[in-house]
A protein has these predicted regions:
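Surface-exposed, charge/polar-rich loops and edge strands
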Residues: 2-42, 46-176
Length: 176
């Protein structure tokens, strides 16, 4: 049995793509997932399963129960912990002036592909580093609107390929 993390993209934002996390938890348990827990209302799920490929099962549950076609990023908990263990020294500094994110790629694109599509980060305003299939991204809160990556990650054609979590959220998920 493996422990997994499922990250749902774009749910419960401004009343759109509404999914009750307790209902989703119950549906997952009824489908054979074990030790299911959710964190926040933004689509962070931790569970144990014997299934090798849980992603289509989760997507189908969401489609059938909530009538929503929501992309799911699935990662083994051990892989997530490895990613966090290899975070750049500048990421998750604890500074309230910085916003530290981890970008997960939903599409078949590699992290390098996404980075190339978005382009270089804004000098002195943001930092980006790729590790395996994710991108660490940090920017100053006071200048976020000037950041190249801030603008590009929300554009059509790119936003759909990503799901983004803050450093704090990812750390909390990894402790479950």
């Amino acid at each position: 049995m493996n422990k997994y993390v499922a990250l749902l993209r774009g749910i419960n934002i401004s009343g759109k793509n509404r999914i009750d996390m307790s209902e989703l938890k119950s549906e997952l348990e009824a489908s054979g997932f074990r030790e299911v827990s959710t964190y926040l209302n933004s689509g962070n799920i931790v569970f144990v399963s014997e299934m090798a490929n849980c992603k289509p099962v989760i997507e189908n549950i969401i489609l059938q129960k909530f009538k929503l076609d929501i992309p799911v990023y699935l990662i083994e908990m051990e892989e997530l912990k490895d990613i966090l263990a290899h975070s750049p020294i500048w990421w998750d500094s604890g500074s309230k002036d910085k916003y530290d994110n981890l970008i997960f790629i939903l599409s078949s694109d590699s992290a390098e592909d996404i980075s190339a599509i978005i382009g270089n980060p804004s000098d002195n305003l943001e930092r980006v580093e790729i590790y395996k299939s994710v991108i660490f991204w940090t920017f100053e809160r006071s200048t976020y609107q000037k950041c190249h990556w801030w603008k590009k990650t929300s554009e059509n054609g790119i936003a759909e390929r990503l799901t983004i979590r803050t450093a704090n959220t990812v750390k909390k998920i990894s402790q479950r």
